[in-house]
Amino acid sequence: MDNNKKQVIPRSQYRRKRREYFHNVEREERIRREKIEKENQAKREQHQTKVNEERVKDNLRKARIEKLTQEEIHQQRDDKSYKQKTLNQNNQMNKSKDDDNKIGEESLHDVRVSSDTSTLPHQNKSIKDYDDSGNESKQHTKLTSKESMLGVNSNHTEQDSRSTQPYSSKHSYSQPKDKDNDNTQQAQFLKKEDKQRNRAENIKKVNEFKQLVVAFFKEHWPKMLIIIGIIVLLLILNAIFTTVNKNDHTNDSAFNGTAKDETTAMKIAENSVKSVVTVENDLSNDTTVSDNKNESDNEIGSGVVYKKVGDSIYIFTNAHVVGDQEKQKVTYGNDKSVTGKVIGKDKWSDLAVVKAKVADENIKPMTMGDSNNIKLAEPILVIGNPLGTDFKGSVSQGIVSGLNRHVPVDIDKNDNYDALMKAFQIDAPVNPGNSGGAVVDRDGRLIGIVSLKIDMHNVEGMAFAIPINDVRKIAKELEHKGKVNYPNTEIKIKNVGDLDDSERNAINLPAKVNHGVLIGEVKENGLGDKAGLKKGDVIVELDGKKIEDNLRYRQVIYSHYDDQKTITAKIYRNGAEKNIKIKLK
């Protein structure tokens, strides 16, 4: 075989065989059914067309009959009116006839003869006209001959001829009028047919247009979806940019001071600042916090004027602000300062009361609120003097972040917690110098005194204030006694959580008890001894409140400083549960 020659495969080897025809019974049956259905549809349409034509003809027939009826009614009305006119004319002629009664029989006879002779030519003429004009002229001839035979007077004959002539003329034109009516009805029929034909053509055009629209959407629906998607996207973008513009406008109006809430906050701050003073236990001229001195020797904070008697003002502040100094420097107004005196303080509640004499009438007591009505997330303002008098009257805004917090406090700075402080949590910025400052609600009422904050590198916005109801009760004790006398059960206690297994086994403490305080020693004749408490007892509940540790125990006991009532203690003694009454006075 020659390699240069192209190899060709015979067509008989690779040609595709012709497909055999398969008889599709279902398809032929479907086509036959469709054909029969189309024929039936055509027959129905043809039948409906005939029915419509019959209805049109019937309607035209009815319309024609109705029209003829109306014409007959009008004809009768015209005849009636004409007869009435004829009757009136006859009455008038009768009156004139009475006036002519004086004429003799002779003249009347002459008139009759003359009328007879005059009617003969007319009679001949009417007979001649009978051959030309037919029935209509014959009737007129009979009437004329009858009048001549009766021999009526000339006036009466003329009147009868007048009354007969219009009636004859009306009937003489009735036949052309019917022809005109037929032509009119035929024209109306043709006009209605044209209207129906036009209506059918319009319906056909509408259907064809609908079919074209449907075919267009079927063919181009992907493109239509893309176009609709683009339009929706543009509308969404427009709505987004419109909202952004509205927000920008709102922010602009807020900065312009048009918002009602900001105006209210401004008024509250303006009034409340006058009741907040600076309290400093260092009487030197430098009123700025110094890093070179010990914090306990140079503590600076804020105070709130809550009462004014004469020229003396009473100030709420913190015990850690006044420290151990009895004299305090009180700065108010435009850097005016006086020396105040600490009349009472309580380290357990971190509260102190300072009294000073101020003659300035602008210094007014702040309105007291009710801390029992504080709500979570309630907006508040914090007013104080952070970092000293250089930033006095600072106002920060926030909300109430938490209620009924029990915050452990290290009072003596020995890295051990000494007490639990009852407070509510705020998120407003609190800095050194804000201690003792005011927490006011949206109505400008004092609801708390700033006490402390959590100062850790990974904690922000956690400050605490003493509820004003507790502050007022303790301040009352401090005003009268200079201190708060707390009840003391005179027992030494240890946390159950700090016990090891041997100590738990020694007192037969059940395994389920993992909280409370263990009594180590009981002072003789003390409140605990009188109540029946013994060494080795474990107090797990006091006054219906769960005791977790010694801080909670002290807080529950100290909360009864004002009433000193008898409370119930739930204890475990040698593994057995027992209730004991403790008198706090």
UniProtKB/Swiss-Prot annotation:
PROSITE patterns referenced in this protein's UniProt entry, alphabetically: PDZ
GO biological process, one term: proteolysis
E.C. number: 3.4.21.-
Transmembrane stretches, start-end: 224-244
Alphabetically ordered keywords of this record: Cell membrane, Hydrolase, Membrane, Protease, Serine protease, Transmembrane, Transmembrane helix
Chief location of this protein within or outside the cell: membrane
Skewed-composition ranges (Polar residues): 84-94, 114-124, 151-175
Domain PDZ as annotated: residue spans: 516-575
Biased composition regions of type Basic and acidic residues, renumbered to the chain: 21-82, 95-113, 126-139
GO CC list: plasma membrane
Residues annotated as catalytic: 320 (charge relay system), 350 (charge relay system), 435 (charge relay system)
PANTHER family given in the database record: PEPTIDASE S12, PROTEASE DO-LIKE 8, CHLOROPLASTIC
Protein name: Serine protease HtrA-like
Species lineage: Bacteria, Bacillati, Bacillota, Bacilli, Bacillales
